[in-house]
Amino acid sequence: MNKPESNLNSVNPPNLRSTIVAASAMPWQPTQFEGIEMKILYSDDEGRSTILFKMAPGSVVPLHEHTALEQTFILEGSLEDAEGSCGAGDFVWRPGGNIHVAHAPRGATFLAIFNRPNRFFDGTKFFTSAE
């Protein structure tokens, strides 16, 4: 965040100041799913997280349940499931209880915001869960 004026000072104490994440400088990390990489931009002990994902063409996120609201903004490519397809510039949100399989036939890059970790039916842990 650039300061519009050089004499501006934060009025917030250190624990309430903005945290700037240089996402473009972060390396992509592998996930437990083939062809899917991520950058965890935010996560907390209550299960909230913001994750940038990159899915290779043909990659799949297997059957899972959203245990709380999940919001996704598609930056590149497209994501598909049984309920439809969303492409670059589209926003999709899913309520808690939504169950689906997501796939990216042509690849996709997207930002996802989770209020709680997903539950994978094959027992796989969520992206931010410790192994």
Regions found by a protein language model. Give the residues of each.
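A short, N-terminal "cap"/entry segment at the start of jelly-roll beta-barrel domains
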Residues: M1-G47, T128-E131
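Conserved short histidine dyad/triad with adjacent acidic residue
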Residues: E34-H66, S85, P95-I99
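Conserved catalytic motifs of the protein kinase core domain
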Residues: R48, E70, G107
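Glycine- and acidic-residue-biased ligand/ion/polar-headgroup-sensing regions
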Residues: A56-P57, H66-D81, A88
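Residue-level marker of beta-strand positions
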Residues: V60, D90-F91, T109
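Short acidic-glycine-tyrosine-enriched beta hairpin
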Residues: E80-A104
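Ligand-binding loop in jelly-roll beta-barrel domains
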Residues: G96-F121
